[in-house]
Amino acid sequence: MISSNDFRTGTSIVMDGAVWKVVEFLHVKPGKGSAFVRTKLKSVQTGNVVEKTFRAGETVPQANIEKSVMQHTYKDGDQYVFMDMETFEEVSIAPDTLGDKAKFIKEEMEVSVVTWDGTILDVELPTSVVLEIVETDPGVKGDTATGGTKPAILETGAQVMVPLFIAQGERIKVDTRDGSYLGRDNA
């Protein structure tokens, strides 16, 4: 149990049988009446955001969320198979749990898997990944003057917009949060 006075951004609580993460909180002490805590909560499962007010000192169950580092080993049909880096146990994750993140996951990539009571809630990717371009239109000399972009298909099947000077076979950095081109890979 956690007191509403101890809420901080990122605190996870259980409310109505679901896990909620505190996005914003504000302790309010009105001139008349008792103090309260106004919060914005985000559902970890659905992403919905709700506003909820708690009395000061009210206790709610705290969610015991665990994060474990796992490595994507292979894809079995449409299931993504990850291996826990400490216990070496394998876990299959459905594409609907991954959502849009699935298009940036490649083999041997390390991710953080968030679980609650044995249920996988989320898979957190690194903020950027290096992927190879497998298909794009060829660049023509002098194309950079216009500053335009063209579509490129990556090794994972994702499609991103890249500058005109980028060629097929190059390795680029991609932001996993929005799928935007960040630059060429220097390694």
From Swiss-Prot:
Signal peptide, first to last residue: none
UniProt xrefs under InterPro entries: Elong-fact-P_C, NA-bd_OB-fold, Rib_uL2_dom2, Transl_elong_fac_P/YeiP, Transl_elong_KOW-like, Transl_elong_P/YeiP_cen, Transl_elong_P/YeiP_CS, Transl_elongation_fac_P
Pfam families xref list: EFP, EFP_N, Elong-fact-P_C
Pathway where this protein functions: Protein biosynthesis; polypeptide chain elongation
GO-annotated biological processes: peptide biosynthetic process
CDD domains named in the record: S1_EF-P_repeat_1, S1_EF-P_repeat_2
The keyword Cell wall biogenesis/degradation is annotated on this UniProt entry: no
Cellular-component GO terms for this entry: cytoplasm
Similarity comment text for this entry: Belongs to the elongation factor P family.
Cited function: Involved in peptide bond synthesis. Stimulates efficient translation and peptide-bond synthesis on native or reconstituted 70S ribosomes in vitro. Probably functions indirectly by altering the affinity of the ribosome for aminoacyl-tRNA, thus increasing their reactivity as acceptors for peptidyl transferase.
Name of the protein: Elongation factor P
Organism: Synechocystis sp. (strain ATCC 27184 / PCC 6803 / Kazusa)
